[in-house]
């Protein structure tokens, strides 16, 4: 987690206070010259992580670090990589809603809208493949497929399996689409399955999970 933080941040500060403790501690580092831990102040229990985002480098092709301050970018990253973490990840999200109509509004009144912020849960928390097959309907399989892969058609086949061994256990949910991807016969096609560990996306296209002859 700290390594990923320093990919976009020039300085990381962690303020933590254990439940039942009167003392908080502050961990700080710039990612280059070690770190410091000192007593600090925190009114409530828990942990706050504060990132100082790097300034954008010059150049047209340079990375833009301030995009990680944008709501849609952060929420998209959470849904992509941490959608199945087993605790809620919440964020203040903007929503547009109509203002109350005035009592003396004219007949041709056009509604006015305002932006409000609500604390939304971004992740679904429970992956479908960890549930027992007997508790899942085909409609639920199909709905998950459509939402996950942005395909309006139902899959041609759904394969859901669970395996336990001495050294490893896994759940697998495979979908065979009704039609081949548009880029299937092009050089740009990337094969592979999505690989998750403890609910976190490790690889989006892991080619080694499924051999070509399958």
What are the language-model segments listed below?
Residues 2-112:
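GHKL-type ATPase core
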Residues 72, 87, 107-214:
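GHKL/Histidine-kinase-like ATPase module
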């Amino acid at each position: 987690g700290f390594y990923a933080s320093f990919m976009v941040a020039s300085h990381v500060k962690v303020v933590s206070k254990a439940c039942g403790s009167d003392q908080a501690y502050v961990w700080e580092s710039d990612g280059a010259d070690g770190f410091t831990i000192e007593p600090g102040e925190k009114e409530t229990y828990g942990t706050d992580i504060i990132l100082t985002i790097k300034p954008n480098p010059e150049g047209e092709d340079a990375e833009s670090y301030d995009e990680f301050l944008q709501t849609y970018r952060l929420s998209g990253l959470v849904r992509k990589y941490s959608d199945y973490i087993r605790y809620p990840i919440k964020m203040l999200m903007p929503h547009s809603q109509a203002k109350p109509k005035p009592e003396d509004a004219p007949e041709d009144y056009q509604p006015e809208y305002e932006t409000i912020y609500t604390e939304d849960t971004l992740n679904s928390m429970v992956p479908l493949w960890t549930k027992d097959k007997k508790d899942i309907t085909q409609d639920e399989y199909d709905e998950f497929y459509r939402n996950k892969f942005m395909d309006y058609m139902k899959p041609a086949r759904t394969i859901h399996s669970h395996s336990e061994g001495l050294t490893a256990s896994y759940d697998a949910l495979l979908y065979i689409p009704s039609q081949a991807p548009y880029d299937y016969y092009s050089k740009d096609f990337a094969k592979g399955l999505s690989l998750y560990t403890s609910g976190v996306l490790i690889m989006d296209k892991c080619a080694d999970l499924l051999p070509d002859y399958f």
